[in-house]
Amino acid sequence: VGKLILANFRAGAAAAPADAAPLLDAALAAMRSLAGQAAMEAASSSATTRGVVVDATSAHVAALEPARGAPGRHVWTYRIRVTNANPPGSPDASLQVVSRGWDVQDAAGRPHARVPPGSRGVVGTTPILGPADCFEYFSSTDCGAQGGSMEGRLGVAVLESAGGTFDAAVARFALRPPPARAGRGGGGHGSESE
């Protein structure tokens, strides 16, 4: 992609003015796309526990105005995708997500919000996942203007055997501040909204 961008800039410089604009527009669009991909990568994580793959991605969605002397809050949405990568016939072939636990830290690494491990379900449900099944949900949390990070665990019950339950890790992912707000102060108290 970098070579494509460079080629379009070079071609735009050598082209007639009428032909240069589309080439330069394409190069700039590719650069914006790369920046967006880099930001998404920085706010994503993936972890696999006993064949359960948990992918997480977050995005800043809003800055809330302070209310009655309280500091302003910023809200992030996050997407969690849980995939059962266990093959048919394996001991962990049929699974159910039964609980969750979250730790949200501010940009300095201080605890900001917590959902205790064992809190029932995810977004009001306890999905069952057969082999190759996937369940995806969206939720939100708040944090100060500087952002922070989030990590946790999903309690998973094995349905087909005496496998009991285990915790599937949700690897730490960033709550990145919006570019216009980066470097500004912020604080606030908040909670994960599930």
Model region roles, listed by residue range:
Residues T57, R79-T83, D103, S140, ...:
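Residue-level recognition of well-ordered beta-strand positions that form the cores
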Residues S58-W76, P88-A93, T126-P131, D142-A145:
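Short, solvent-exposed beta-strand/turn "edge" segments of beta-rich domains on protein surfaces
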Residues R73-R79, M150-E151:
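Short, solvent-exposed loop/turn segments enriched in Ser/Thr/Gly
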Residues P88-H112:
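Short acidic, flexible loop segments centered on an aromatic residue
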Residues G109-G147:
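Intrinsically disordered, low-complexity Pro/Gly/Ser/Thr-rich segments with frequent PxxP/GP/PP motifs
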